[in-house]
Amino acid sequence: MNKFKGFLYGMTASATFGLLPLFTLPTMAEGMTTDSILCYRMLFASLLVAVLMMVRRVNFSVGVRELSWLVLLGFFYYGSAALLFQAYGSMSSGMATTLHFLYPVGVTLIMAVLFKQRPSPFTIIAIILALSGVALLSLRGSGGAEGSASLVGILLVLLSGLSYAIYLVTVNNVRRIREMDNLKLTLYVLLSSAGFFLINASFNGGVQAIPSGAALVNLLLLAFLPTLVSNLSLVRAIKSIGSTLTSVLGAMEPLTAIVIGVVVFGETISGTMALGILLIIVAVTIIVLSPLLDKNIAERLRRFAQRPIGRR
């Protein structure tokens, strides 16, 4: 049951992350820069988490070592978003999204090399299907498979994915972080990220004033659904099912963005995109069922090994 909840948290995290365009695009249309939007997003989300902590009477205090890890996590979280936005200036958004979503591969490699955790065959199959699905969905943003990219752009987006992969792995494998209250962890990661975004914005004209009441509402919703809800769900998922499985479930993020584009912004779904959606759904289904599938295969192999040689 705990793992089932973990899968639900993972899908909730990726689905709510996919709501980013719903609140970001209208705000950008009013003239706000991405630096300002991201800064307000993290600050407002931090305030919401702080209110929740006060309601639930969660202690705000952290030790020096814990704070060091939290600031580092905030840096990786900031780096993932900042590097991805930088990469958008050097290549098509579709290509950048596809390369960024290689991060499940990064998580799998880090877990295998540093923690000797080998992925199951079903996890590998799910990763391949999810990456293929994301690639097909991303073609919508690049006008097909065309598009060029500079070496710097490719490096930026790969570093973006690596930064997010390190964030996912760290949350689950550093004891001080893994045992920390989820609200406290989320608060200090978001606050640290806000600080880094604020520094970045100061080099690009500073943080803009919020232009209207509608923009304020969108920023608050941006802070709540694709930030507060998604990050709390993400942390719960990582602690329940691990970094690798959570990272693969992240493929639902572009799927949600597609649905929002169709329903809210009147975009159309092509045959290629439909195939991408199908591949992601199959990948997520495999991930959810993987514990049962792995257990079933292990049991069959055990029974086969116990059979007399003459009867095999």
Language-model-detected regions and their locations in the chain:
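Helix-helix packing/entry segments at the starts of transmembrane helices
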Residues: 8, 14, 40, 96-102, ...
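Specific transmembrane alpha-helical segments of multi-pass solute transporters/efflux pumps
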Residues: 16-21, 53-100, 136, 223-241
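C-terminal transmembrane-helix exit sites in multi-pass transporters
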Residues: 48, 53-54, 103-128, 255-275
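Hydrophobic alpha-helical transmembrane segments of multi-pass integral membrane proteins
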Residues: 4-9, 35-51, 126-132, 152-159, ...
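Glycine-/small-residue-enriched transmembrane alpha-helix faces in small-molecule transporters
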Residues: 1-40, 75, 83, 146-173, ...
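Juxtamembrane helix-loop boundary signature in multi-pass membrane transporters
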Residues: 1-11, 105-162, 277-312
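Membrane-interface helix-cap regions at the ends of transmembrane helices
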Residues: 19, 26, 45-63, 132-147, ...
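Hydrophobic/aromatic residues within transmembrane alpha-helices
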Residues: 27, 37, 41, 87, ...
